[in-house]
Amino acid sequence: MVDFEYSIPTRIFFGKDKINVLGRELKKYGSKVLIVYGGGSIKRNGIYDKAVSILEKNSIKFYELAGVEPNPRVTTVEKGVKICRENGVEVVLAIGGGSAIDCAKVIAAACEYDGNPWDIVLDGSKIKRVLPIASILTIAATGSEMDTWAVINNMDTNEKLIAAHPDMAPKFSILDPTYTYTVPTNQTAAGTADIMSHIFEVYFSNTKTAYLQDRMAEALLRTCIKYGGIALEKPDDYEARANLMWASSLAINGLLTYGKDTNWSVHLMEHELSAYYDITHGVGLAILTPNWMEYILNNDTVYKFVEYGVNVWGIDKEKNHYDIAHQAIQKTRDYFVNVLGLPSRLRDVGIEEEKLDIMAKESVKLTGGTIGNLRPVNASEVLQIFKKSV
């Protein structure tokens, strides 16, 4: 296990009706709030009305930024920054999933930066101060409710990049599993794939001495595998929704990463797909992941796929190691396609070979020419993975 510093500062209020703490907690940080949300589902399901009622009862003045895109755009961030500056906003509250939360995070950071918000996405060292952030989660997927990251799109440059700062972790997040009952099946499926991908990114590491972290990762993967299908069949199954929601947070809040050397790969590949084609993030991950697994499988990496196959999928450990590895990868593909109902090919979401080369090059541009940890891949290898996925 490698050395690490531990800090997961976000306070979590988990369970039914935990929204009732909203007023009390917000007032710790200010009395002027910007509410950031997406396409209006929170108004249809009553979450918006409940939140606004609480703010009004607590004499908290609020402003709104609606219409955050599924792949949030820097132009939307700019709108939020303008609202905050014109009204002296003190706290940014996201209500929604990862898109709303990520947008809120960059707004909170950009408010304190005298320049173009895209600057702080390109260079996180320019972030010096961040307005307090809070979130009410409505979908289990990105884990933004408990991490320090945000992913933002620039449609002018076809870039989808990560902004990060320790103070971008929400001060608190409210996780009520009942708020995910009305999430459409396609979003539940894509969200489950996203959670699993976050785990894969840190699980498939060449740190062989992180026994504890790997066993926790396997438990979270088994949780997703068990409850993803149940949530699709029974959208109001509380235990399924609760387990997926908490798995979302634990998958990416650092718990699985501390003590390991990690370097993400599939996410950076997928960011190029959704930067150029604006596809659903979790769908792109589900398509790429099995093909990436097959590509990096070799004599040096097979041991990790054996661990994965035996401990996550229950494959007989006495089998040939490569048989276990291939079976585990196939089970992963089958789960994404047959249980979650996600597409299996890039062409299914409108991506052909036209831009694969440029996307492959862009995926490694900011990482020294390679991505990944267990077996790093370069641009030409990413291109091969893309081609296998078409």
Swiss-Prot record:
Further comment: Primarily NADH-dependent, although some NADPH-dependent activity was observed.
Gene Ontology CC annotations of this record: cytosol
Protein known as: NADH-dependent butanol dehydrogenase B
GO terms under biological process: 1-butanol biosynthetic process
Pfam families: ADH_Fe_C, Fe-ADH
Subunit relationships: Homodimer.
Enzyme superclass (EC): oxidoreductase
Family: Belongs to the iron-containing alcohol dehydrogenase family.
GO molecular function: alcohol dehydrogenase (NADP+) activity; butanol dehydrogenase (NAD+) activity; metal ion binding; methylglyoxal reductase (NADPH) (acetol producing) activity
PANTHER family in the record: ALCOHOL DEHYDROGENASE YQHD
